[in-house]
């Protein structure tokens, strides 16, 4: 194999391996971005986060409804017999007078009356009314509304946290799929080289230049590479299945590797930024605000509750409905908890502890995110150094293989030495693809640590 051909192959491999990291921010792969947007729309885990957000929105509407009038229909009917009574001696009081009047008038206009015994339990009595209630002063429901409004912001931050984690996972899976695909290509190239060696060794054996040892060794190497290809193809399938899983689509769907992003031979420097805009910190800030509102809500027992009500209905015996049975009733209710054996105070103290606890969690998270960013940047610099080393190693391995190949074809080199050079070249190509993917993964980790991807 000529030096010119090998150089062209090396150039093609390098061009395929190098990623346009310089275009990471403003000119990122449209194909990869399209995949990310598709995941935003289809990923099941993200859908669950949106369901929780929708639930919080409805919870806020529920809290708002507590400030509006509540109308309910209430009805009851009683049938009673026996029990306590009120005895009214109407006959004893009026009958003597009625008898005297009948004698004076010589008539019976005034009948004799019986004493009455009235049941205290109403018999055959109904009461149906519409009750309208309206809170006038109630600090608890006021705080409940503010808490649920903050909870919406908390859930929205949770959605963004999941999105950023999903972006990193998708990019990492994309690079792993790329790396697995390159491994298949590299092993296929190695197989072609071994097949060429078999052809040359067969020719040498036919011409009596060498014995069958080199040919046997070449065939054994071919079987080893075939096994490596099988393993690499399996890793590629698994990487593709995981990538499709993140996008919530058929696990065997094809994956496009945008060729326009394999143009640059330069690795860009790591982006700079801070982690003070991390949505996790926004979540903790909202949780702290909710805890503070909960504390204030627990202290709201000091303010009395005041509400009003209006009843419009009808009540009478024997299901009578007329102008006499219809009625209305309006009133004002006052509730003021004056003593509860310290329950409210202890509840307020628990809420105060929650506020302090969340503040401590915020401080810890802020420091941990700084550590995460520093670690990601250190990993990036290490990955870049490894990439540069792998790049240099590939160039040296390529030159070494070309030199050994020439000497072998001239019959001045053992096949085992040529095979060693070929394996070094294959390993160098694999190492470069691994190092390249590690650089891109490190960049994705920095992007995640800085929360810099535009959602």
Question: For each predicted feature, which ranges?
Answer:
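Transmembrane beta-barrel architecture of outer-membrane proteins
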Residues: 125-127, 172, 217, 305, ...
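Amphipathic alpha-helical coiled-coil segments
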Residues: 48-63, 162, 168-185, 203, ...
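Bacterial Sec-pathway N-terminal export signals of envelope proteins
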Residues: 25-85, 209, 250-292, 366, ...
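Primarily recognizes Gram-negative and organellar outer-membrane beta-barrels
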Residues: 42, 72, 76-120, 209, ...
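Terminal intrinsically disordered/low-complexity segments used for targeting and assembly
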Residues: 1-38, 74, 83-115, 233-269, ...
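Membrane-embedded beta-strands of outer-membrane beta-barrel proteins
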Residues: 130-132, 332
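Periplasmic alpha-helical coiled-coil/stalk elements that build and connect Gram-negative outer-membrane
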Residues: 3, 34, 58-60, 157-277, ...
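Small/polar (Gly/Ser/Thr/Ala-rich) solvent-exposed segments
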Residues: 47, 70-85, 116-123, 133-161, ...
């Amino acid at each position: 194999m000529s030096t010119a051909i090998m150089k062209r192959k090396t150039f093609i491999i390098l061009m395929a391996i190098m990623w346009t990291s310089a275009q990471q921010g403003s000119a990122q792969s449209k194909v990869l971005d399209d995949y990310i947007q598709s995941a935003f729309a289809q990923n099941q885990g993200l859908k669950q986060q949106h369901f929780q957000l929708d639930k919080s929105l409805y919870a806020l509407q529920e809290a708002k409804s507590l400030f509006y009038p509540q109308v309910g229909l209430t009805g009851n009917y009683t049938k009673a017999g026996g029990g306590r009574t009120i005895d009214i001696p109407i006959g004893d009081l009026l009958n003597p007078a009625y008898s005297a009047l009948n004698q004076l008038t010589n008539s019976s206009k005034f009948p004799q009356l019986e004493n009455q015994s009235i049941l205290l339990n109403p018999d055959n009595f109904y009461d149906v009314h519409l009750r309208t209630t309206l809170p006038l002063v109630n600090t608890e429901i006021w705080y409940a509304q503010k808490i649920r409004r903050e909870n919406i912001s908390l859930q929205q931050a949770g959605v963004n946290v999941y999105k950023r984690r999903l972006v990193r996972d998708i990019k990492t899976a994309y690079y792993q799929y790329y790396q697995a695909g390159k491994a298949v290509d590299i092993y296929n190239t190695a197989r072609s080289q071994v097949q060429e060696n078999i052809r040359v060794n067969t020719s040498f054996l036919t011409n009596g230049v060498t014995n069958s040892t080199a040919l046997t060794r070449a065939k054994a190497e071919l079987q080893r590479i075939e096994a490596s290809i099988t393993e690499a193809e399996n890793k590629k399938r698994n990487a593709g299945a995981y990538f499709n899983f993140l996008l919530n689509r058929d696990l065997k769907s094809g994956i496009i590797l945008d060729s326009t992003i394999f143009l640059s031979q330069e690795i860009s420097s790591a982006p700079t930024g801070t982690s003070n805009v991390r949505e996790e910190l926004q979540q903790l800030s909202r949780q702290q605000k909710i805890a503070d509102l909960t504390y204030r809500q627990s202290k709201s027992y000091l303010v009395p509750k005041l509400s009003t009500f209006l009843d419009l209905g009808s009540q009478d015996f024997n299901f009578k409905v007329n102008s006499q049975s219809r009625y209305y009733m309006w009133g004002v209710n006052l509730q003021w908890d004056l003593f509860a054996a310290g329950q409210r105070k202890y509840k307020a103290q628990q809420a105060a502890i929650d506020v302090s606890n969340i503040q401590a969690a915020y401080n810890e998270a802020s420091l941990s995110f700084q550590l995460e960013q520093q670690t990601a940047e250190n990993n990036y610099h290490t990955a870049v150094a490894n990439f540069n080393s792998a790049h240099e190693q590939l160039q040296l391995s390529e030159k070494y293989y070309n030199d050994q190949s020439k000497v072998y074809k001239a019959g001045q080199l053992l096949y085992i030495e040529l095979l060693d050079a070929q394996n070094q070249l294959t390993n160098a190509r694999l190492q470069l693809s691994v190092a390249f993917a590690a650089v891109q993964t490190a960049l994705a980790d920095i992007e995640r640590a800085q929360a810099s991807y535009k959602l």
